[in-house]
């Protein structure tokens, strides 16, 4: 979920003024940071972390970050990312699903509008990126958690670190764009230009929207969903602190985390993400291109 500003504000609101804001802000990028890798393997891993064995990985992150204050703030930011995604993504997917199916471009536009909405009422600037030594330490802990979660991963630590740096750099630029007046323009499935604006978000919510996974109709909009996300973030941070103090074991922590998909907000095994319309179109173009190429060779 590329709502950088919303993720960061949720994490820093829950963690308070005494946290390491740079580390927590990087943690608030969650698994999205891996999408900024130049390596397809890391991007694919980022996708899997959103919708497979989610509680298990979060426990590994907390374990890997337990003995360093800045890394603990990073891990709690990561928990906040999970809480915000679980709260908001059903709404985002509902708004991104059109007659022909789910559109990843409209998903992005919706999340930019969410950032614009929150930046418009918050007006708090984004946190700065962690310094080099802090990023190196966080990178090592994140890499350790990944290897615990998937031991056969061929992890390039240098590329993982580059992804973290790009995430904070490009994420900051996108966060500022999210606060600009106006809306992000996208094309619908008929090729007609559409807008997704902050005002549309609340109007869509008030008209009632259907959760794509549960079928439940809701009128909750950005304010209600943000309230739910902040409440859940507070619960997860409290559980993490109990775990670090030895007052909660890993199995209990997993139960508190809920093992939910970041995308559906439901149990990950029973709520696979929809395939974007754009992916099907890309495959169709590739088939036509490869067919024409093979005919030319003959």
Predicted stretch roles:
Residues 1-76, 83-298:
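N-terminal leader/auxiliary helical segments
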């Amino acid at each position: 979920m590329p709502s950088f500003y919303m993720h960061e504000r949720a994490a820093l609101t829950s963690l308070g003024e005494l946290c390491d804001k740079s580390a927590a802000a990087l943690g608030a990028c969650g698994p999205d940071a891996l999408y900024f890798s130049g390596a397809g393997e890391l991007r694919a891993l980022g996708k899997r972390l959103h919708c497979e064995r989610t509680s298990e990985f979060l426990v590994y992150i907390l374990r890997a970050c337990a003995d360093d204050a800045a890394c603990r703030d990073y891990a709690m930011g990561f928990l906040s990312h999970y809480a915000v995604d679980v709260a908001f993504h059903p709404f985002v997917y509902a708004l991104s699903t059109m007659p022909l199916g789910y559109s990843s471009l409209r998903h992005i536009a919706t999340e930019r509008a969410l950032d614009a909405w929150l930046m418009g009422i918050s007006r708090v600037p984004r946190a700065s990126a962690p310094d080099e030594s802090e990023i190196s330490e966080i990178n090592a802990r994140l890499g350790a958690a990944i290897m615990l979660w998937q031991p056969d991963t061929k992890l390039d630590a240098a590329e993982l670190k580059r992804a973290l740096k790009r995430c904070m750099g490009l994420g900051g630029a996108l966060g500022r764009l999210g606060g600009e007046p106006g809306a992000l323009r996208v094309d619908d499935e008929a090729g007609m230009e559409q807008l997704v604006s902050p005002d549309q978000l609340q109007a869509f919510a008030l008209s009632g929207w259907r959760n794509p996974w549960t079928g439940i109709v809701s009128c909750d909009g950005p304010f209600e969903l943000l309230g739910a996300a902040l409440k859940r973030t507070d619960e997860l941070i409290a559980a993490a602190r109990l775990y670090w103090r030895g007052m909660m074991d890993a199995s209990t922590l997993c139960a508190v985390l809920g093992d939910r998909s970041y995308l559906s907000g439901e149990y990950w095994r029973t709520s696979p993400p929809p395939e974007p319309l754009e992916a099907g179109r890309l495959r169709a173009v590739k088939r036509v291109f490869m067919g024409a190429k093979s005919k030319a060779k003959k």
